[in-house]
Amino acid sequence: GLGDVYKRQDLIGKTPLVELGKYSASKGLETPVIAKVEFFNPGGSVKDRIALAMIEDAEQKGILKPGATIIEPTSGNTGVGLALVSAVKGYHLILTMPETMSVERRNLVKAYGAEVRLTSGKDGMPGAIKAAEELRDSIPGSVILGQFTNPANPAKHYATTGPEIWADTDGEIDIFVAGVGTGGTISGIAKYLKEQNPNVKVIAVAVSYTHL
């Protein structure tokens, strides 16, 4: 039978932890450094988690109807995750992004069936956001999921990524480090970890020109 054949969205999450032994040794660290291998997600990044979460949240709230159009301004991996989940669930996806984004990323989301609308590079993400809003206003029943402000983003990490890290380390975690884009990953995971142990130290890594 097909008992061991999974739908692609079922492969999102439950990623393994890998000990970075050589790195720890090179830095003379006594405590092991462990990485969560989020590129094992089918779309290749942690953003698969929130793509699935935001779409399912919109479905449950009745905001997103079957066969509707999803619109999202994105220059990163969220677009890949949304393209993957939209393809599986039968939604039309339009991604607005600055023309400065790589051709490889554009081709990847197109391979999943997404439509790409490029905006002026000099307008940056604000230009992509404006284009997305104009599209939403012109396409009946369309939805912008809004990863930067959508509570389903941190909630997904609180419900899944945080508990996975805690369980797989048997609670033996002193410091949690994460890169910051929307802030959803670090805030959701940190909330869960600190509820288990208030002494866990949380460190955010962000580029110098971050909006945070």
Spans of model-derived segments:
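ABC transporter nucleotide-binding domains
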Residues: 1
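PLP-dependent amino-acid enzyme catalytic core
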Residues: 4-212
